[in-house]
A protein has these predicted regions:
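N-terminal catalytic cores of NTP/NDP-binding nucleotidyl/phosphoryl-transfer enzymes
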Residues: 9-63, 67
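Classical nucleotidyltransferase
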Residues: 88-195, 210, 218
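Phosphate/ribose-recognition catalytic cores of enzymes acting on nucleotide-derived substrates
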Residues: 185-231
Length: 231
């Protein structure tokens, strides 16, 4: 999979199937959108995820998002920060200049409450209208719900901040995980025959609250059951 961070101009991509959103955490709602663009690869389209905006603390790191999307079958991940140009671009111009002009879109998948463009005036209905005129198909997916609440990145963040790891697993479809750099300590665990590892997580990674968690650690193709103290 190709990863591109958009600093100025978008790349020229031919025949793309695109889904748009924040995608800071690839929860079950995002996964349905990604599955839709993957289906379009059978028609010769390139599956493109256009991630709009970035958060200072993310549910998934860039490396984690890239790995998950690549495993799902995505061809290109475009990360587009909300620059002055993007934030002030009218929705009509976003469709014409970026989706049609740069990405040569043939298919778009969005959620029913997706908004884009200046003052968030761009809607799924607008995408459908422009699609009829310019020759691309827009598929609008209903909200993925958990009871009466929409599954969203905000929902995932709230449950992670509460330390509700079972709910996190349900919303994301996978367990919480973290990769980091091992920092050597004073060797107290080794002294008492209780092996320990001090892991420094990425600074941008959103972590659960301080506390003790049952975990599985992976190292050199082996897995070790244990407990982890966060904090």
């Amino acid at each position: 999979m190709e990863y591109l961070r958009i600093e100025n101009d978008f790349p020229r991509i031919s025949h793309s199937a695109v889904t748009l959103g924040k995608f800071d955490g690839i929860h079950r709602g995002h996964q349905k959108l990604v599955e839709k663009i993957i289906e379009q690869k059978q028609e010769g389209a390139q599956a493109v995820v256009l991630a709009l905006g970035t958060a200072s603390r993310t549910i998934l790191t860039k490396e984690e998002r890239c790995r998950i999307l690549e495993e799902m079958g995505v061809d290109i991940l475009l990360e587009c920060p909300l620059t002055e140009k993007i934030r002030h671009m009218k929705a009509e111009n976003f469709i014409k200049e970026i989706l049609i002009g740069d990405l040569q879109v043939s298919y778009v998948a969005v959620g029913e409450d997706f908004r884009f463009g200046y003052e968030r005036k761009g809607t799924p209905a607008m995408l459908k209208e422009f699609g009829k005129k310019y020759g691309f198909h827009t598929e609008v997916l209903p909200k993925k719900m958990d009871g009466r609440r929409k599954i969203s990145s905000t929902f995932v963040r709230e449950e992670l901040n509460r330390g509700n790891m079972e709910k996190f697993r349900f919303l994301m479809g996978t367990d919480f995980s973290v990769e980091g750099i091992v920092e050597h300590g004073r060797g107290m665990g080794h002294k008492y025959l209780l092996p320990t590892t001090n892991l420094i997580p990425p600074v941008e990674k959103l972590m659960p609250p301080n506390g003790v968690y049952i975990t599985v650690s992976h190292f050199r193709d082996r897995s070790y059951q244990g407990i982890t103290n966060v904090g």
